[in-house]
Amino acid sequence: MAGLFDSGMIGKTRIRNRLIMPPVATCYSDNGYVTEDMVNYYKRIAEGGAGAVIVEAAHPWQGIAYGSGALGIWDDSMVEGLSRLSGAIKSAGAAAFLQLGHNGPQASENQVSPSGIPYIRDTSPKELSIAEIIDIEDGFAAAAVRAQKAGFDGVELHGAHFYLLSCFLSPLMNKRTDIYGIDSEGRTRIVCETIGKIKERCGRDYTVSVRVNAREGMEGSIDGDELKAIVGHLEKAGVDVIDLSSNDVSFPAQLKRCTVGTVSIPRADAPQGIFTGYAAEVKEYAKVPVITVGKITDKEFAEELISKGTADFIAMARPLIADPDLPNKFLNGGEINSCIYCNACIGAVARNRRMVCTVNPDIK
């Protein structure tokens, strides 16, 4: 059985250990362009011993993100800054991946969705035509080419948390009656075709991850059977790893603003490893590696997840924001600057402000 600090493979990319920094928005960008603050932030996480860093969602189009602090990849002029970013991460020994995302019905303007169903109340997202869907697939592929030119080891398609691709995957949000809906094959088509286009343009060996919701916590949404079907279709399309999140944390207060009353962020009182049971479920049938996430904080717990085969890799977001040296401290010992799960980091970004951290004085 593998150990927490054994290397592992994601596609053709070797990862030095099983600890991964997942994509979390920082608002450190300057109108889409990489800044020195962003480079330093991610380099610091890599220096702390993470096996891989998945950089926050970069947007292949203007006008689909939250604001000026969101990272972009819509123009060739952005490649230079992204190259500095990937280079800084890899110089510290971590693999570098870049998430690609389209906010869809959660965009600050020009909201779109598979079926015109809103995520944010009092908005009317446009239902995408087939021609527009194909353009979006091509836009993701063009962004992947830029990411490859910038030196990233691979890309991740953001298919979770009710952003655009997530809405296509979800029976709750996708009510289309054409080839991009109806059943799991149709609902996954946009993601599968995008994987194919990325592999065609970047090479079959270029690593592609897809982040998906294991559950969505509402009637008519993704359940265990639907998840199994989604993973099967993604594997046939050539996905290299499943980054398994979930969106079934009950949050009724959100219904004042949104049409969905669940979120992906475990609260402070949530049990450790809240989503890891879903990873164990997927490991029963998946042929590609599985990344798990969800309030994983203790070394012994993390070691057990890997040694028992619950997951192949562990993503730790808020714990690595609070203490980027956590992987090295797991390995060598040392007092950990523990996350208190106050969500100051996420709250700031949700207001389109720079990430802050209550317990890490370097993030302010």
Predicted features by range, described:
Residues 1-364:
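Flavin-dependent oxidoreductase catalytic cores
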